[in-house]
């Protein structure tokens, strides 16, 4: 995925250094989102940050469109969520600030969703609730504008955030019910060509929630199901490995940890999860 999008990115890289961007650059922005996604799955966090910093340096566009708005929202969101840096996610802000975000509620919703997940995971429930209110407002705008697909996406985003708010409030049954509903809704929808994948799959989040509730066998089933729809995801594979290990399924754990090592063979960052995988495989 990374190499397939590199040519498009390099072809327009010179334009990315300008303070105003023409329409030809949007192919590069689109490619950059795919590249950041791919880098983060392979634990090439430094490469991902280089691209994210290039995006962050852009302050003005002379032509605005959805592809650009989506990239501006998705790339910083991916960087935070794919590193499970919930504090960073909770601090996400729309940028460039003078982009007409009101024209692109479906793009703004990506960042608001990511920020609200960060808030819910860090226990700042009030901030998460405020963002849920914003998501409802954005969903209404999409519905009015006949953006049915994106309104549906925002609907399951709302459910997912409400699930993590419920978990923070120790309403565990409600949390699992809402998270499962979000996962089912997401999987009933198609992937839009603008994106390599949602910023975080709801089924993957369900697996992590079940792990937090000490239900590793159930979590393993959800991670494995998530990997069918969203294969080769760092957190999906690590989650499956960790769930298998915790549920006493050593063979499956070994297989998943080995897959994780293969996926990240060209990594530029030694994440703690990779150290755990190496330690597990060394002991077995």
Predicted regions, residues:
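Solenoid-like repeat scaffolds
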Residues: 10-22, 56-66, 93-105, 136-150, ...
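"A position-specific structural signal for the A-helix of alpha-solenoid helical repeats
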Residues: 34, 75, 110, 114, ...
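Alpha-solenoid helical repeat scaffolds
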Residues: 19-20, 33, 67, 113, ...
């Amino acid at each position: 995925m990374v190499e397939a999008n590199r040519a498009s990115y390099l072809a327009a890289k010179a334009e990315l250094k300008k303070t105003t961007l023409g329409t030809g650059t949007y192919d590069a922005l689109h490619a950059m989102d795919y590249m950041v996604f791919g880098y983060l799955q392979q634990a090439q966090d430094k490469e991902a940050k280089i691209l994210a910093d290039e995006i962050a340096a852009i302050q003005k566009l002379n032509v605005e469109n959805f592809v650009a708005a989506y990239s501006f929202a998705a790339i910083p969101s991916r960087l935070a969520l794919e590193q499970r840096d919930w504090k960073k996610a909770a601090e996400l802000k729309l940028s460039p600030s003078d982009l007409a975000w009101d024209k692109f509620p479906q793009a703004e919703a990506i960042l608001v969703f990511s920020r609200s997940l960060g808030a819910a995971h860090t226990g700042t429930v009030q901030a998460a609730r405020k963002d849920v209110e914003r998501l409802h407002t954005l969903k209404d705008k999409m519905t009015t504008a006949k953006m049915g697909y994106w309104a549906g996406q925002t609907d399951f985003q709302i459910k997912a955030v409400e699930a993590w708010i419920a978990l923070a409030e120790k309403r565990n049954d409600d949390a699992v019910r809402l998270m499962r509903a979000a996962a089912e809704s997401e999987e009933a929808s198609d992937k839009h060509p603008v994106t390599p994948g949602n910023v975080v799959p709801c089924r993957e989040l369900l697996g992590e929630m079940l792990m937090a509730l000490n239900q590793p066998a159930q979590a393993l089933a959800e991670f494995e199901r998530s990997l069918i729809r969203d294969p080769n995801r760092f957190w999906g594979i690590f989650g499956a490995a960790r769930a298998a290990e915790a549920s006493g399924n050593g063979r499956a754990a070994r297989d998943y940890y080995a897959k994780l090592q293969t996926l990240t063979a060209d990594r530029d960052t030694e994440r703690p999860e990779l150290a755990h995988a190496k330690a597990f495989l060394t002991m077995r």
